[in-house]
């Protein structure tokens, strides 16, 4: 693994960990039980994704709270319809970003497929 690949895997792991916290916080502010369950399920999936990257990096990272603070605020400000579009775009962009890692790190393909 090159130094650049390692840095990219670390960035990806950090992003997935940040998403876990973000989805957990969103689950606390949504209005319906169905939305709450959906966000908790997404948090669980993002945790699995982070563990895939952790298997390669062997680094213990902590989630950063920035998005976990901003997204519930945006939920209240923009409403769920607009916010969900932003979240979906972020997930799709992440999937595209993982494509070039698959050749060297095959487990990343499962993460990429989940993100779409």
Task: Tell me the role of every PLM-derived stretch.
Residues 1-116:
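Non-heme di-metal
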């Amino acid at each position: 693994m090159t130094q650049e690949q390692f840095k990219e895997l670390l960035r990806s792991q950090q992003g997935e960990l940040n998403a876990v916290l973000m989805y957990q916080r969103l689950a606390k502010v949504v209005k319906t039980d169905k939305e709450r369950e959906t966000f908790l399920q997404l948090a669980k999936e993002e945790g699995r994704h982070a563990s895939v990257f952790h298997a390669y990096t062997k680094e213990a990272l902590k989630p950063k709270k920035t998005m976990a603070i901003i997204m519930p605020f945006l939920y209240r400000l923009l409403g769920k319809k607009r916010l969900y579009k932003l979240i979906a775009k972020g997930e799709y962009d992440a999937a595209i970003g993982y494509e070039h890692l698959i050749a060297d790190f095959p487990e990343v393909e499962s993460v990429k497929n989940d993100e779409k």
